Amino acid sequence: MSYTLHVATTYKVEYGGALEFNHMQEQIYRLLSHKTTFWANESHDTMEIDRVELLEVADHVEEMSDKMFERIGFKEGFHGDDRYTQEFVANLLRKYADDADPDDNIVHFCWY
């Protein structure tokens, strides 16, 4: 166990815009917790997941049953949008894994 405190002298955060998954923290939380271990704050508006595990979740989304996908919270016409199919969600997760900081193995999600 270490006892000496160290403070980051450089901490840079930049967020890219994402138009998908707005107001969908709970669905993403349930999706990630269904198959992997990740970190989320109490209100689920910040989540972190290993990049490789996120890609595994994307693969799992494409393989899961329609019933399971709906149980997680996605369904046809969700938020008046028919795009949220399993293929669409899986491809978005892959895109976010690709777009995340290449120097970090963790993909950070934040809703604000």
Kindly give the residue locations of the regions a language model identified:
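Acidic (Asp/Glu-rich) sequence patches and key acidic residues
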Residues: M1-N105, W111-Y112
